[in-house]
Amino acid sequence: MKKARRSPSRRKGARLWYVGGSQF
């Protein structure tokens, strides 16, 4: 969730770790 602070929603890979970090 630390990387989520960057809010890199513009990146394609961001959605991968963003969703995984939220659930895990």
Curated annotation (Swiss-Prot):
Any GO molecular function: DNA binding
The intrachain disulfides are: none
InterPro entries, A to Z: Microvir_J-like
Highest taxon listed in the record's lineage:
Viruses
Name the family the entry cites.
Belongs to the microviridae J protein family.
Which terms in the GO cellular component ontology are assigned?
host cell cytoplasm; viral capsid
Q: What is the lineage of its organism?
A: Viruses, Monodnaviria, Sangervirae, Phixviricota, Malgrandaviricetes
What is the protein name given in its UniProt record? DNA-binding protein J
Q: Which Pfam families match?
A: Microvir_J
Organism field: Escherichia phage alpha3
User: What keywords does the record list, in alphabetical order?
Assistant: Capsid protein, DNA-binding, Host cytoplasm, Viral genome packaging, Viral release from host cell, Virion
**Entry function:** Mediates ssDNA packaging into virion, it locates to the internal surface of the capsid, thereby displacing the internal scaffolding protein B during virion formation. Protein J binds to and is packaged with the viral ssDNA. Additionally, protein J plays a role in viral attachment efficiency to the host cell.
Q: How does it assemble?
A: Interacts with F protein.
Q: Where in the cell is it found?
A: Virion; Host cytoplasm
